[in-house]
């Protein structure tokens, strides 16, 4: 097949990695995103990248954009540090202990980075303006042996040779493609916020400011997670200096602050928690930590009062994925996981780069599309579901996450 048109539902990190890969291969691609703009919803804050994610970005981006990514990514000390509620170190775990499932890196490419998620997404969006359609909520698709058509809530449709569901944990593509695939409540809830790094410098130790991530647990298994994002060059300045194809929003250095645990600890229903304002969530985080030392409670107390948001955590249940000739899935659409190992976004981007390589083989005549999808899905579900299970086991052990149904 010398010509191929790929439809991607979802403009998250995995779908954008795939799109960037396909542009480099000169494969026609169109992206459909349900949000009305890149900034419709909170994009989250710090993201830890391991060699899976970094390799995928390296393979997918053109050199100028990879240079911009590197210039705006923190290279932390590669440890996840376990501390007590007073932030005294109990042990430091090398990040590679739960790192890449790919096990290889390009020479000279770091194996661990802390990045600002919104900055990374903006870099991945660069150059996609002509193929990205916002406000397109996919409802279903129709496929036959020769093509697939994506149907949208606004009554429009798009036709291509392949549809990729990169549309997240509530994937409409997955509901039709793998209707027996299930997602379940992990039982874990969290409040995310951040504080300026200048404030954090007076509140936390050097290790907290330099390690990949730091986590404290109390007797109730309430946890406090802390992760720095220190830009080698501020994103907007890096973009102006390196003259890439687009601008980046300014963002100062910060420390992410996550307070989480079993949903019963929060004392409110999810609907009420979701309706709380940022300032109310900040106050709730302090009430949750009422038994913690005052010096540690000062960390969320000094957070930006407009930065706090609530997250419910769900996970996929590993299952058999039947073969399809022209519809596939990537990332959270098929193997969503709790963030206990920090692997979800890394694997979504790995999926995108892997699928891109297989589709490159299709247009070069090395294999047909059905073979490419079969090989991609076999590899992707093997490593993806393996990490889903490991993340659930770690969550159960550390914070009391619900076990996966097959393990209960």
Residue ranges and their predicted role:
Residues 14, 37, 170:
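Conserved Rossmann-like nucleotide-cofactor binding loop
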Residues 2-6, 50-177, 181-196, 267, ...:
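Conserved N-terminal helical subregion
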Residues 42, 61, 177, 341, ...:
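Short, flexible helix/strand-to-coil boundary loops that buttress conserved ligand/catalytic motifs
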Residues 8-28, 32, 164-165, 191, ...:
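Conserved mid-domain beta->alpha element of the FAD-binding
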Residues 2-4, 66-74, 79-99, 298, ...:
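C-terminal helical "tail/cap" subdomain of flavin- and related membrane-associated enzymes
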Residues 36-56:
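Conserved N-terminal glycine-rich FAD pyrophosphate-binding loop of Rossmann-like flavoproteins
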Residues 88-116, 192-304:
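Conserved FAD/dinucleotide-binding core of flavoprotein oxidoreductases
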Residues 41-45, 273, 340-343, 367:
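Short, solvent-exposed loop/turn segments at secondary-structure boundaries
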């Amino acid at each position: 097949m010398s010509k191929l048109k790929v439809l991607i539902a979802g403009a998250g990190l995995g779908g954008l990695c795939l799109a960037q890969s396909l542009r480099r291969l000169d494969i026609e691609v169109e992206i459909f995103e349900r949000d009305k703009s890149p900034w419709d919803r909170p994009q989250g804050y710090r993201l830890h990248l391991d060699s899976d994610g970094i390799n995928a970005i390296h393979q997918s981006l053109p050199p100028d954009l990879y240079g911009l990514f590197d210039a705006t990514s923190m290279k932390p000390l590669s440890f996840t540090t376990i501390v007590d509620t007073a932030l005294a170190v109990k042990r430091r775990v090398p990040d590679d202990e739960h790192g890449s499932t790919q096990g290889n890196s390009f020479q000279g490419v770091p194996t661990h980075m802390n990045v600002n998620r919104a900055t990374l997404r903006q870099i991945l969006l660069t150059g996609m303006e002509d193929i990205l359609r916002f406000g397109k909520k996919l409802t279903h698709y129709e496929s036959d042996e020769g093509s697939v058509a994506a149907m949208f809530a606004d009554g429009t449709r798009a036709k291509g040779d392949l549809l990729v569901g990169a549309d997240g944990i509530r994937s409409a593509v997955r509901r039709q493609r793998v209707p027996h695939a299930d997602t379940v409540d992990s039982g874990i809830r969290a409040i995310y916020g951040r504080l300026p790094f200048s404030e954090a410098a007076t509140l936390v130790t050097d290790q907290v400011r330099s390690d990949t991530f730091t986590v404290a647990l109390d007797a109730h298994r309430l946890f406090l997670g802390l992760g720095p994002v220190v830009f080698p060059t501020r994103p907007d300045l890096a973009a102006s200096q390196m003259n890439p194809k687009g601008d980046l929003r300014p963002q100062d250095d910060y420390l992410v602050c996550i307070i989480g645990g079993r949903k019963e600890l929060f004392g409110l229903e999810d609907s009420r928690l979701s309706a709380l304002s940022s300032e109310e969530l900040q106050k709730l985080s302090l009430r949750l930590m009422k038994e913690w030392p005052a010096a540690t409670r000062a960390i969320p107390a000094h957070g930006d009062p407009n930065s706090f948001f609530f997250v419910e955590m769900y996970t996929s249940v590993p299952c058999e994925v039947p073969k399809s000739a022209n519809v596939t899935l990537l990332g959270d659409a098929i193997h969503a996981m709790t963030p206990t190992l920090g692997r979800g976004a890394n694997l979504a981007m790995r999926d995108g780069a892997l699928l891109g390589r297989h589709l490159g083989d299709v247009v070069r005549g090395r294999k047909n599309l059905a073979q490419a999808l079969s090989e991609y899905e076999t590899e992707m579900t093997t490593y993806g579901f393996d990490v889903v299970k490991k993340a659930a086991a770690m969550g159960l052990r550390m914070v009391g996450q619900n076990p996966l149904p097959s393990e209960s």
